[in-house]
Curated annotation (Swiss-Prot):
This is Anthranilate phosphoribosyltransferase. It holds the Pfam family Glycos_trans_3N. Homodimer. Pathway: Amino-acid biosynthesis; L-tryptophan biosynthesis; L-tryptophan from chorismate: step 2/5. Its cofactor is Mg(2+). Belongs to the anthranilate phosphoribosyltransferase family. GO terms for molecular function: anthranilate phosphoribosyltransferase activity; magnesium ion binding. Keywords: Amino-acid biosynthesis, Aromatic amino acid biosynthesis, Glycosyltransferase, Magnesium, Metal-binding, Transferase, Tryptophan biosynthesis. GO terms for biological process: L-tryptophan biosynthetic process. Binds 2 magnesium ions per monomer.
Length: 339
């Protein structure tokens, strides 16, 4: 059957929901050859994944995921993005997770090691001294007690082992970059989700709505960022239950002066680690902290703890400079030692 799906995809035809679910069951259960996996991933990429295809694949990912037994999901958010931006920024969404948690919002930070960037969220978490491969029960306890738990994708998506090597060998972004943020194992109902392509903003928002998200922002910085940008305009899709509104924002809308790309560039793991520590310790007074605060502002507004993004930015800066974000890191490090 997989050959029939490959033929259809390579002819530029969309798969139905049932076909896509069947195809992803085949991939996730290790029933496809390397050549077939490569053909499916590149074929879908060349064709362009439909909303129905993405949501069907995400449903299979969610079904097969190991669940995280968080006690209170009422205001649980994830800041996992697709990765693969074109600018090589530092780990904005990971630092943002600490800031959000520092203000008392519970975060289930889903992430992985780098696949298409220099330094993934799992890489930076590990460098910060956080144990990344906690059991589902330990991660749930970290979320409930500390306010932040890291959900290392391979622990929660064991079926992904059947495609991870092929993804790395292909070396380009595929549907799996999109599916990761759509498959939070803790069932977070709020999201700040950055995507690497402006053409994904509205489709991913529609997928989130289909998957039952309560409120989310799907964002793409127009210079190629999977974050809210402080250097140029950002395309935004705001998801509020079944309602979706798409619009553009610029840094000046929030009282933030535009930065240059050099102001927000990251580097290798050591370089990004130092940036993360400087921001979390409240030592950084550069545009990097503005960048994190802007993204945290959107996250705070998504979850409903502030009335506006601008108010969220102020809350983010207050959380950073009062060392509350760093306190979350210290608690997570301590918890990691006992975990």
């Amino acid at each position: 059957m997989i050959k029939e799906y490959i033929r259809k995809i390579t002819e530029g035809k969309d798969l139905s929901a049932d076909e896509m679910k069947d195809l992803f069951n085949i991939l996730m259960e290790g029933q496809a050859t390397d050549a077939q996996i490569g053909a499916v991933l590149i074929g879908l990429k060349m064709k362009g994944e439909s909303v129905e295809e993405i949501s069907s694949a995400a449903q299979i990912m969610r079904e097969k995921a190991v669940k995280v037994p968080v006690k209170d999901r009422s205001r649980l958010i994830d800041t996992c993005g697709t990765g693969g931006d074109k600018v090589d920024t530092f780990n904005v969404s990971t630092i943002t997770a600490f800031v959000i948690a520092g203000a008392g919002v519970k975060v289930a930070k889903h992430g992985n090691r780098s696949v298409s960037s220099k330094c993934g969220s799992a890489d930076i978490m590990e460098a910060l001294g956080v144990k990344i491969d906690l059991s589902p029960e330990q991660a749930a306890e970290a979320i409930d007690r500390i306010g932040l738990g890291f959900l290392f994708a391979p622990v929660y998506h064991p079926a992904m082992k059947n495609v991870i090597r092929q993804r790395r060998e292909i070396g380009v972004r595929t549907i799996f970059n999109i599916l990761g943020p759509l498959s939070n194992p803790a069932g977070a109902k709020y999201q700040l989700l950055g995507v690497y392509d402006k053409d994904l903003v509205e489709p991913v928002a529609r997928v989130l709505s289909l998957l039952g998200i309560e409120r989310a922002y799907v964002v793409h910085g127009m210079e190629g960022l999977d974050e809210v940008s402080i250097t140029t305009d950002t395309m935004v899709a705001e998801v509020d239950g079944g309602d979706i509104s798409v619009y553009s924002v610029k840094p000046e809308d929030f009282g933030i002066e535009r930065a240059s790309l050099d102001d927000i560039r990251g580097g290798d793991l050591d370089f990004n680690l130092q940036i993360a520590l400087d921001i979390l310790e409240g030592k950084d007074r550069s545009r990097k902290t503005d960048f994190v605060s802007l993204n945290a502002g959107f996250a705070f507004h998504a979850v409903g703890v502030v009335d506006s993004v601008k108010e969220g930015i102020e809350l983010a800066k207050e959380t950073i400079y009062s060392k509350k974000a760093y306190e979350i890191l210290e608690k997570l490090r301590e918890y990691s030692k006992g975990g």
